Design a protein with these regions (language model features):
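Walker B catalytic acidic pair
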Residues: 121-122, 140-141
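Post-Walker A helix-loop "phosphate-sensing" segment adjacent to the P-loop in P-loop NTPases
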Residues: 56-64, 85-86, 160, 183-186
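Post-DEXD/H (motif II) to motif III coupling segment of the RecA-like Helicase ATP-binding lobe
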Residues: 131-136, 142-192
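P-loop (Walker A) phosphate-binding loop of NTP-binding proteins
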Residues: 40, 68, 167
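Conserved helix-turn-beta segment of the N-terminal RecA-like "Helicase ATP-binding" lobe
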Residues: 72-109
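Pre-Walker A segment
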Residues: 1-64
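Glycine-centered short loops/turns at secondary-structure junctions
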Residues: 60-61, 88, 113, 194
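Conserved motor-coupling elements within RecA-like helicase/translocase cores
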Residues: 97-118, 128-134
């Protein structure tokens, strides 16, 4: 993971490094990761997700990033592509507005493993979406998706690692009640800009 961390245009905070260490341990474990990452908007959750995606792809897996809106999907696509292109990691975008011919091509490339990271909206939940080897599912703004929807995307892989991210502050006790099956990481310091 140090390759991608060193290529980031900013230094990671201590909290980001701690969260990445937790995620790294989870991804190395026999048990699939099931982690909630909570942090304010701008706290660097996307950078953490990019590093986790890099690790998954370099370990031979595909990554699905599911977000609630096409605008956010496009934003993530630009960020992931910018950071991962230099490592020959192919990132693609799939939203409901994707042209039919382009969508068919992406679905085929996803199925054959030519796409490493797919970023999309609810479009990723469609029945005809198949992965070659899905190993990591990241759901951003997880509260905007139901349990069933998250279950659909998770079932497209064979026990993939799961990372759900939220900017909505969730008191730890409530988080344990609502997401008792998840390990919880809270980004508790602001990312330095510049």
């Amino acid at each position: 993971m140090s390759d991608v961390i060193d290529s980031l245009p900013f230094a990671l905070t201590k909290a980001q490094i701690r969260v990445l260490q937790e995620i790294d341990q989870d991804m190395e474990s026999i048990k699939s990761m099931n982690r909630l990452l909570q942090g304010d908007v701008g706290s660097g959750k996307t950078a953490v997700a990019i590093v986790a995606a890099y690790k998954a792809v370099k370990s031979g897996y595909q990554v699905a990033i599911m977000v609630p809106t096409a605008i956010l999907a496009n934003q993530h696509y630009q960020n992931f592509k910018k950071m991962l292109d230099r490592f020959s990691i192919k990132c693609e975008l799939l939203v409901s507005g994707t042209a039919k011919k382009e969508k068919e091509k992406k679905l085929e490339e996803l199925k054959t493993g030519k796409i490493d990271v797919i970023i999309g909206t609810h479009a990723l939940l469609q029945e005809n979406i198949e992965f070659n080897k899905l190993g990591l599912v990241v759901t951003d703004e997880q509260h905007r998706f139901g349990v069933r929807q998250r279950g659909i995307i998770n079932s497209k892989g064979e026990n993939p690692d799961i990372l759900v991210m939220s900017a909505t502050p969730i008191p730890r006790t409530l988080a344990l009640i609502l997401y008792g099956d998840l390990d919880i990481s809270i980004r508790s310091e602001e990312r330095r800009v510049g």
